[in-house]
Amino acid sequence: MHLRGCACHLSLYCVYNDWENKIYRVPIFQCLFLEAETRSLKTFLIRGQSLDQESLNEIEVTRKETMLWDLQEQSNMMDKKIAAISNLIMNNGELVRTLSKFFVPLTVVLGDDGLEILEAYVCGEELMLPLDTVPVILRCIGDYAALDTKHLLSNECTQASKKIRFGYSVMDFHFSLTVSDVKICFSHTDTGEAVCEKMKQIFSFSVCAFGGEQVLLVTPKNAYALLFDDDLCLLLLQSVFAFLHEKIFGVYKQVLVQLCEYIGPDLWPFGNERSVSFIGYPNLWLLSVSDLERRVPDTTYICREILSFCGLAPILGPRGRHAVPVVRELSIEMPGSETSLQRFRFNSQYVSSESLCFQTGPEDTHLFFSDSDMYVVTLPDCLRLLLKSTVPKAFLPCFDENATEIDLLLKFMSRLQHRSYALFDAVIFMLDAFVSAFQRACTLMGMRWLLVRDLHMFYLTCDGKDTHVVMPLLQTAVENCWEKTTEIKQRPTFQCAEISRCGFIVYARFFLSSGLSQSKEAHWTVTASKYLSACIRTNKTGLCFASITVYFQDMMCVFIANRYNVSYWIEEFDPNDYCLEYHEGLLDCSRYTAVMSEDGQLVRQARGIALTDKINFSYYILVTLRVLRRWVESKFEDVEQTQFIRWENRMLCEHIHLLHLN
């Protein structure tokens, strides 16, 4: 029997021993398949090639066995485990490898039972996206067992890792699964029969004979992805699926039990990417989404997100990514030098580096002040055009041509560098050639090169030239350099902002720049950038305390107006880089949102709840004033510097209490 469609998800069902035929350690894979004709989802099984005992041992390493006191050894053991899992799914024969290319049109050959896939062939280049499906949305609340916080005082690993090590657990929980307008509520006290009845509203259950055993296929009726909020505790997430697995397979006792093994960032002592995968149950994607309560991504965005993985979920590491071929050969000879996404970060000739006292993390603060005009050239679609010209259609996420989606583009780029070396080098080489040519052209125009941000924003300065002359020259330079170095006919979208005579950049954990003064985004960094720009612009020849006081009061008015606005204050932090106050749940094992507290520590701050009363508003004011002080020190004599310090202290004393008034 032949069937046309596409694979939407692939995982392991279990590893079993075929005693009758004396075949041991046989992996059974399960594929969530979208049938083209009926547009319905089906689950098929694939019989894999037998594993050797060593590989099986690496896959079956338990969480308890990974909890080593040597944290680096623990991290290495987890890396080894996920490498074995990824290698099993990606390299267990050509059939399984073909089915791991998601949304690619396939023709599959089924066995007589209509259950097992025997062969699979790619039958088209255009992606077959399941746009008529909807995601399952998980929401969960729970209570945790008490834990002595003295176990969490050290800072050698994440709080999440320490909590797991000392037996942190969920006492009780309640959760819901929502599909479209159907919301199903569950409690940890539900019986197995009740759970199965509820689940059958959005999943189909089918008991089938396979390889001399009975298997249970749990197939989502109209979904291939489950979404949960970034701020959902990962321990609650694990508890939900362990509960569902136990209850369902407790009712269907006669079947071969499906695996249900969680892989997430909390298993690494120093944290990992915000990505989750279950080996076995459930057979669908689990995606973490920012601010899910207010904004549910559409199916197109979910497809793009999955395609940007280049294979399996990111948490399964580089071995879980496809080796993507280059779609065209470059006519320019590529050098053999190592490439890096950080290559164009700073021109150190003009941007100084130092550690400032207001920095709470490990990074240096990079500072630049200039009396020259500053130009910010943005090419929002240059990465998309480069990828479109080099990546085969079957692997290219369908990026929206009307949206920048720069974060998704950068993630996709970073994932290419692990296994798709030739492709990654080709893209970076073209970008390098273009940027080098553009830099030379700017130098010939008398412009100084400062910074490249996120591979598509270029910061430059220029003295004494008319803006109406410079901008057309910059656009011409971009177009000519692009055409000569990339051989791509479509030109990138050109955007340019000019900042007159007040150029500055502060690049640290946060980013402040005179270029942000034109932004409409509501965030403290934008307000601070506008304040600093105004002060620098109007104090070229002398320090006028009357003017900077007025600007400071304007900034304070905006700060006060936003003092309850969570999104205005929160920032994202990498795990284990900063000292974090105790919080409930496992929430700091991947990139998380937080605000600064009064005692200099971070406080976890979710997007969807009220702003914590522990926030230290004075920190954000102090950061802004310290940057202004650095500018004063670089521009004026000791007398003005002393006067500024007095003024700074007076402003803090007179205004800081206003942010705490109700």
From Swiss-Prot:
<comment type="subunit">
    <text>Associates with the primase and the helicase to form the helicase-primase complex. Interacts with the origin-binding protein. Interacts with the polymerase catalytic subunit.</text>
</comment>
<dbReference type="InterPro" id="IPR004996">
    <property type="entry name" value="HSV_HEPA"/>
</dbReference>
<dbReference type="GO" id="GO:0042025">
    <property type="term" value="C:host cell nucleus"/>
</dbReference>
<protein>
    <recommendedName>
        <fullName>DNA helicase/primase complex-associated protein</fullName>
    </recommendedName>
</protein>
<keyword id="KW-0235">DNA replication</keyword>
<comment type="function">
    <text>Component of the helicase/primase complex. Unwinds the DNA at the replication forks and generates single-stranded DNA for both leading and lagging strand synthesis. The primase synthesizes short RNA primers on the lagging strand that the polymerase presumably elongates using dNTPs. The primase-associated factor has no known catalytic activity in the complex and may serve to facilitate the formation of the replisome by directly interacting with the origin-binding protein and the polymerase.</text>
</comment>
<comment type="similarity">
    <text>Belongs to the herpesviridae HEPA family.</text>
</comment>
<keyword id="KW-1048">Host nucleus</keyword>
<dbReference type="GO" id="GO:0019079">
    <property type="term" value="P:viral genome replication"/>
</dbReference>
<dbReference type="Pfam" id="PF03324">
    <property type="entry name" value="Herpes_HEPA"/>
</dbReference>
<dbReference type="GO" id="GO:0006260">
    <property type="term" value="P:DNA replication"/>
</dbReference>
